[in-house]
Amino acid sequence: MTLDLDASKKDDKLLLTTVQQEYKILAEYKMIESEKIGGVYVIPSYANSLQWFGVFFGRKDFYSEGVFRFTLLLPDRFPDDKTLPSIIFQQKIFHPLICPYTHSLDISHAFPEWRCGDDHLWQLLKYMQAVFSDPLESIRHVEMDKLKNSEAADLLINNREEFANRTRENIRESLAHIYDTPITEDPHYITFEKFQSEVHGPVLEGIKAGQSKHLESQSQQSNNGGNGGGGGAATGLSWVKEGEFKPLSVE
């Protein structure tokens, strides 16, 4: 009887721990939604909240127009464990911080360890965005022998033209596989469909109409002297101060 009670208590404790973890992960997802990180889309797997599906759209310089799929893996005890999450791309990407064999992004230079309450997944995704936007800046303070792809670093520093050629190969490969059959049956896996005017046309027109109304509203506000005619720019708090990865930095 005592053994049954002990087992029951252990089961209850495990259930409570799991529920608490699920709420923490949901809170992380809500923060990402609020942050609106341009060109980055993620969603937890339907089957496993520790596995997230993601897509990154390159918008600047070397990786512009690339569509790169990745998986975000959270440690079993996330976020209480100091172990770092992992970002693993589905395809090879030529970048000094991405391993050419495992396709994993090295985040340790920005996050030496995971600090529960201080570090958040939206910051991690912003860092990923930053290393693609400015790869040279992302390795400025990293020793060459600590980089995952020293060849990429060498070309980035000494032969930009060849570096650009290699990244364009990555972009072409990413676009060639954008409509591939999903690698999993998980309903949350992000998929793309080719444009069909009869299906997607009305949605596109609705988006255009909404943008037109938004621009018209902005124009009217500008003509009226800004916010409610009071003048002056709005002030307050932002989630992240430009050039930093700290939450709630004063603008």
From Swiss-Prot:
This is Protein crossbronx. It comes from Drosophila willistoni (Fruit fly). Signal peptide: none annotated. InterPro entries: Ub_conjugating_enzyme, UBQ-conjugat_E2_core, UBQ-conjugating_enzyme/RWD. Residues 20-176 form the UBC core domain. PROSITE patterns: UBC_2. Gene3D superfamilies: Ubiquitin Conjugating Enzyme. Belongs to the ubiquitin-conjugating enzyme family. FTS subfamily. It holds the Pfam family UQ_con. Residues 225-234 have a biased composition (Gly residues). Residues 211-251 are annotated as: Disordered. The gene is cbx.
